[in-house]
C-alpha cells in the first residue's frame, strides 16, 4: 500500500510540474531536441549540430514581455555564459541580440532571438543560437524566421 501511495504521489508530482498541454513535447523530441528543463513555469530544450547549437526556452507567465527577455539577456545570461553583448537589431518579427565570446575551440558567436509577439498568451519564447561563424543581419533574419516557425509549430 505504501508503495502504491508513493508511486501515485511521484506520478502526480511529475504531471503537476510539466509544461502546459498546449506544448507538443512529443513533436519536440521527435525533431531531435533534448528537453533540459520541464517545470510549471519554464520549458527549455536544445539541439546540438556541428555548425550551430540551439537552446530554446519557453516561459509560461502572464507577467512577461519581450523587453524583459531582452534585458535579461544583456544583464544576466550573456555575462553568465562569458559572452560580450555587442549589438542588437530588429526585424518585422523579432529582436535579435548579438554577442561573442571565447571557448576551447576559439571564438563563438551568440544570437538571442526574442519574438515581438507571442503565439499564445502567457507563453514567451527565447531562442539562443551559438555558432563559430559571425552571421550577417540578413542571414540572421532568415535563421530567426526559420527557427521561430519551427518552435511556434510546437505550440498548439
Q: Where would I find each of the regions flagged by the language model?
A:
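Sec-dependent N-terminal signal peptides
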Residues: 4-16
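N-terminal "mature-domain start" segment
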Residues: 18-45, 82, 146-147, 151
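Surface-exposed amphipathic alpha-helical segments
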Residues: 30-33, 127-156
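Short, surface-exposed coil-to-beta transition loops
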Residues: 38-42, 53-55, 103-113, 122-124
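Generic recognition of long tandem-repeat/solenoid scaffolds
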Residues: 41-49, 93-99
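A short acidic-to-branched-hydrophobic micro-motif
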Residues: 46-72, 123-130
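Extracytoplasmic/secreted envelope proteins and their assembly/folding machinery
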Residues: 66, 70-74, 141-148
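Signature of long, low-cysteine stretches enriched in small and polar/charged residues
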Residues: 79-119
Amino acid at each position: 500500500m505504501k508503495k502504491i501511495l508513493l508511486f501515485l504521489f511521484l506520478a502526480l508530482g511529475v504531471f503537476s510540474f510539466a509544461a502546459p498541454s498546449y506544448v507538443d513535447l512529443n513533436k519536440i523530441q521527435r525533431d531531435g531536441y533534448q528537453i533540459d528543463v520541464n517545470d510549471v513555469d519554464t520549458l527549455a530544450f536544445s539541439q546540438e549540430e556541428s555548425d550551430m547549437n540551439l537552446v530554446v526556452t519557453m516561459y509560461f507567465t502572464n507577467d512577461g514581455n519581450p523587453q524583459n527577455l531582452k534585458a535579461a539577456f544583456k544583464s544576466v545570461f550573456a555575462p553568465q555564459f562569458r559572452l560580450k553583448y555587442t549589438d542588437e537589431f530588429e526585424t518585422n518579427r523579432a529582436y535579435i541580440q548579438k554577442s561573442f565570446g571565447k571557448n576551447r575551440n576559439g571564438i563563438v558567436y551568440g544570437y538571442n532571438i526574442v519574438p515581438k509577439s507571442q503565439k499564445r498568451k502567457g507563453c514567451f519564447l527565447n531562442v539562443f543560437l551559438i555558432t563559430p561563424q559571425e552571421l550577417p543581419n540578413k542571414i540572421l533574419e532568415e535563421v530567426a524566421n526559420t527557427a521561430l516557425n519551427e518552435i511556434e509549430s510546437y505550440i498548439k
